[in-house]
């Protein structure tokens, strides 16, 4: 296919037009008084959003060169969203400013590579300034503040996320689902839950709710099928003598083994529930090991030379309570050694750091949560489907921002931290075009506060100049429209979000500034229609065939 090749100024100018088209659509959403963007969908109702990355993802431009510029800035918002979960609009605004200011200087004759070096040095200084201002999150109120701001100043969402994190801990899993009602609620599953229910309904202890609840049971963990009764009879007798219930977790329980368990349970000789092991393959082995460590038992594995008929009570796990329904099993307060559980948690954290697969990371995170504290589910409710989708996106944003805040701490929000980072950039001793590169970053750092203020209906330049004279954490609160200590007022951002936004914006900005040639596919001309010249009477001679 033939290609269009553009050079120098022509190439950069077209890229810039694409950058501005995308950024101008995204930046109206910034701040507490940011506006909505309505996105048309081919099917169903339009999407209404104030989430920068959602807007960016929808934009495809007709002109191939402009679209390249837009897609490069889209990469800024998606990368920031992947790393920090929020800050996508801020990243887009910073990128737009860096590219616009940078291209002015390149057109005026500045060396793009020297500009890039200056930009990189300025960003390093600004990031260090952000890190120094960061304060570790100490309490539930700080978490609620971060979550509320990320959810567009929705205190209800902020408090729900703070409650969830308080209950499951910072390593716990918090998931977001659509509710069946208009209420937004929080459900917390304490202990370890996995998605396998009882093998037979005859094992339930409460026929009305169809749930088996066993108090202080022994837990047999076996990695193969159990089908022969002689393998199991020995351990069933020992558990019955101890007067305790038994939970069997194995690949499968079938045949005479299952029949014996059901008959003895119905006769009340022993209270026993059999459950299939969770997961598949290597993940199943790892999850069985997790359960064993949580309950203080051992995985009875023939790979290790162990036999089911030789199992003793000391090899079985223990827990305060186990509840099993048709679909889920929950182990509450396993009696494993704290030291061993912490060791296992450390091992899983190391695996999370080492893995490159997002799927593996997600599954490891789930295992970690089940060992560390539990799982919380936020059910998002709303009056209409359009509102629910918009609200769910805000909750997911807020959740990601909160995790980022727990990781690297919080800084004053409202664009103030980036503005204050100007001092670190100004202190750099650079010369020539490198100094110009640093000035580009210096100017860009005030752009978010300018846009937040513009969206609130005020003159951004006036607020920016006034903010530069303020000391400490005092800044402009665009929600209440007053000057105050932003941290005390709860206007805070996760340091990781602010840092990632700046680094990603500078990365793409530098790439566009140092672009000299663009290559795009030539638009294909429509091929002539071979039937076009035949006219209506072209096949008239066929009339006699009737």
Curated annotation (Swiss-Prot):
Indicate the secretion signal residues: none
Q: What keywords sit in the KW lines?
A: ATP-binding, Chaperone, Cytoplasm, Isomerase, Nucleotide-binding
User: What is the top-level taxon of the source organism?
Assistant: Bacteria
EC number(s) from the headed UniProt entry: 5.6.1.7
Q: Which GO terms describe its molecular function?
A: ATP binding; ATP-dependent protein folding chaperone; isomerase activity; unfolded protein binding
Subcellular location per UniProt equals: Cytoplasm
CDD domains membership: GroEL
- What family is this protein classified in? Belongs to the chaperonin (HSP60) family.
What is the protein's given name?
Chaperonin GroEL
Q: Source species, please?
A: Leptospira borgpetersenii serovar Hardjo-bovis (strain JB197)
